Amino acid sequence: MHIFDELKERGLIFQTTDEEALRKALEEGQVSYYTGYDPTADSLHLGHLVAILTSRRLQLAGHKPYALVGGATGLIGDPSFKDAERSLQTKDTVDGWVKSIQGQLSRFLDFENGENKAVMVNNYDWFGSISFIDFLRDIGKYFTVNYMMSKESVKKRIETGISYTEFAYQIMQGYDFFVLNQDHNVTLQIGGSDQWGNMTAGTELLRRKADKTGHVITVPLITDATGKKFGKSEGNAVWLNPEKTSPYEMYQFWMNVMDADAIRFLKIFTFLSLDEIEDIRKQFEAAPHERLAQKVLAREVVTLVHGEEAYKEALNITEQLFAGNIKNLSVKELKQGLRGVPNYQVQADENNNIVELLVSSGIVNSKRQAREDVQNGAIYVNGDRIQDLDYVLSDADKLENELTVIRRGKKKYFVLTY
């Protein structure tokens, strides 16, 4: 299947400039293309993965990727469809974020092998040395204010106010495309659909300043079946950095994907063939309660982002917590699996009687409730049911001398630390 058709079939193409010309270019030989990543945090998140994996698919088809990290544009801030001005970051902060993002991208793109190996570039390399006068004379003169004001991303901010700093962002992104075209013969840019205005600023600059044609592909901004923006878990971004979102948390995110989204997400976020995904769809629809699509999705994406060992660990944590086998997990695994659950620091002189601890830690509100829960068999210490009102937690209950896991009922976990 032609790479362009595969991208379409997978739901990865939202808009293109000239589909026929782009398809022809991809057929005739190796195309150099780029995707830009502004450092707005110290990690990329799941929302970035759509463009990253699209870039990887094109590389696997023989085309050459350039990964542009915005060391300069990250200092400015992209106004596209944002309700308010971004806070400006210091150069040291942005530089640190650039390094983190560069490391993450190397997990997905091949920077080492073949004539189409990926190349990392930083737009601070050209913006850092250009003077304001040169910027206005050599770049700004090719953009009319009318053209810049016509961008949807700018229109939405005019009434609430937009600084010249952010207004000029589209020119900077346009110049990125121009520089990469002149220096590396890059003719295609890939980005999110919210970037259309900035990306076509690049094709406009190429046309007017160099009389060349540039192409653009935007990938869709992913939403779930309810229309909710994709890539958030409990309102927080799902990060690609395991220190910010653990492999277990990412695994759970994919396992909780709605049935209506699961097959679509397999096409977007995995490298399984379309035939394999069709087979999974048939099995999934025959027995949706088995959640085959979610299991495959979780396996494929966690392995892709964090590696096979991290996936196996996330799966093991899931299975052991579900079975209540707390003692089968290391403290490291427990910290990953129980990150975010209520945590209580036990004082050295504290009464360690189970009833007293249930109240002092805030697990229950009263001693009466604590006694009822214990007598009814609703309290577990490290997976063991405790029904003795006189039970006192001892050193044996301190896993690796660090923590004790209390479970109330079937699913409510609490962690005591020492």
Swiss-Prot record:
Residues 352-418 form the S4 RNA-binding domain. It is found in: Cytoplasm. Gene3D superfamilies: HUPs, RNA-binding S4 domain, Tyrosyl-Transfer RNA Synthetase. One of its GO terms (cellular component) is cytosol. GO terms for biological process: tyrosyl-tRNA aminoacylation. InterPro entries: aa-tRNA-synth_I_CS, aa-tRNA-synth_Ic, Rossmann-like_a/b/a_fold, S4_RNA-bd, S4_RNA-bd_sf, SYY-like_C, Tyr-tRNA-ligase, Tyr-tRNA-ligase_bac-type. It catalyses: tRNA(Tyr) + L-tyrosine + ATP = L-tyrosyl-tRNA(Tyr) + AMP + diphosphate + H(+). PANTHER family: TYROSINE--TRNA LIGASE, MITOCHONDRIAL, TYROSYL-TRNA SYNTHETASE. Homodimer. Catalyzes the attachment of tyrosine to tRNA(Tyr) in a two-step reaction: tyrosine is first activated by ATP to form Tyr-AMP and then transferred to the acceptor end of tRNA(Tyr). This is Tyrosine--tRNA ligase. It comes from Streptococcus pneumoniae (strain CGSP14).
